[in-house]
């Protein structure tokens, strides 16, 4: 790879990417023809990016020294802190360090606090959409940082994301990602509970899965009710009041029917019972009886 190294000091490269794993590699690929510098501890991970037009660096420090924006997609808080410190030690003032890993918000905030002493800005910019979204360049990215840093990141992030949103100050992107992933993984547990009920009832799980994927693509799934700016109780004159009251009535009816079937079949469905108990309140219909 000696012919594909980052240029010497003095020639400034715009974008660098550190961490070329399952998510980082496809994200970086969308930037490869745009003067991208990359680094990964595994040389074999850099080879496809070099073939696509990127330049391989010998170290994190080498990427940081030549790039105005350094994106980092590594495993956890410890790796983010380690890589972040290497970037701070080598980057020039004015550099933006973008952390795409899912970590604690405090880790991003602490890194940003240290970075300010070097004149470097940090944005926490975790992504949602998985490997398929990264490969297609259709991820959603939730950015926490200053207005100026966000504007500098918006265009390069758009190379691999269809939705680039400024969530607030540093830490806000990570908090949004944790809430989003909480919904995602709770839904997996709910799916397992629904499958147990369907299996006990003699329903084909594969066919049921096809139905779920098909209809969620049409309705938007759980995101279809995430339309309000607050979780406070709805006022009767709210534009969404009648819509969500109708949703509440249908949901409570169908949950009750599912629980009745579960009781008949002896299937334990604790999440469904919690959902029925809290469904109306969750929609903002507190203390309002069904019609």
Could you describe each region identified by the protein language model?
Residues 1-72, 94-95, 166, 200:
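NAD(P)+-binding Rossmann beta1-loop-alpha1 motif at the extreme N-terminus of oxidoreductases
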Residues 15-18, 102-181:
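Rossmann-fold dinucleotide-binding core
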Residues 36, 56, 121-123, 205, ...:
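Hydrophobic beta-strand scaffold residues
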Residues 54-57, 73-74, 89, 116-117, ...:
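Short, hinge-like loop/turn segments at secondary-structure boundaries
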Residues 60-121:
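Rossmann-fold NAD(P) dinucleotide-binding segment
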Residues 173-267, 271, 278-291:
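Helical "substrate-binding/catalytic lid" subdomain
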